[in-house]
């Protein structure tokens, strides 16, 4: 059943891997699922264990350098460019609105980014200036760029946090 739910033939997991509600399932449960399992040994960086929890904390605090050190690469999000409400375009700063495949990224704010290979500025958050919106949005203004990206799958690399989101009065 699990193999059908997660659509995986193999999983790469850590020695202390747990999953499910309240982390109730472990490696032995996976072994029963006929999914090939590869177990990684613990990785340490600066005498501290590297874990997804540690990485998420670094990201949520805006420490992209620590996250990069732990991941071995810059933090990235992929998604598809979709039509937005054109507000950025109306004020001279068109944005690529990204439908994120991961709907709860551990990172929020305004960032210097690369969209594929082009530099830009991204806002990832709830857009507090736009009233009545609580869903997370990722939108990127690509510098000196005018190509049509609608429908394309893009890769956003987070380079530096500029600031938290701010609600503007006008």
How would you label these PLM feature ranges?
Residues 84-170:
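Phosphate/ribose-recognition catalytic cores of enzymes acting on nucleotide-derived substrates
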Residues 1-94, 169:
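Classical nucleotidyltransferase
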């Amino acid at each position: 059943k699990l193999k059908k739910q997660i659509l995986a033939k193999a999983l790469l997991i850590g020695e202390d891997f747990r999953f499910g509600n309240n982390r109730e399932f472990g490696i032995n449960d996976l072994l029963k699922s006929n999914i090939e399992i590869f177990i990684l040994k613990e990785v340490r960086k600066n005498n501290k264990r590297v874990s997804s929890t540690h990485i998420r904390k670094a990201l949520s605090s805006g420490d992209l350098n620590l996250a990069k050190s732990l991941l071995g690469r810059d933090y990235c999000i992929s998604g598809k460019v979709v039509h937005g409400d054109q507000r950025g375009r109306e004020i001279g700063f068109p944005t690529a609105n990204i439908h994120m495949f991961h709907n709860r990224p551990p990172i929020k704010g305004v960032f210097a980014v690369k969209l594929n290979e082009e530099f830009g500025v991204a806002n990832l958050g709830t857009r507090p200036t736009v009233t009545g919106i609580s869903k997370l949005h990722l939108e990127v203004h690509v510098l000196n760029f005018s190509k049509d990206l609608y429908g394309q799958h893009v890769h956003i690399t987070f380079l530096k946090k500029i600031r938290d989101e701010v609600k503007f009065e006008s």
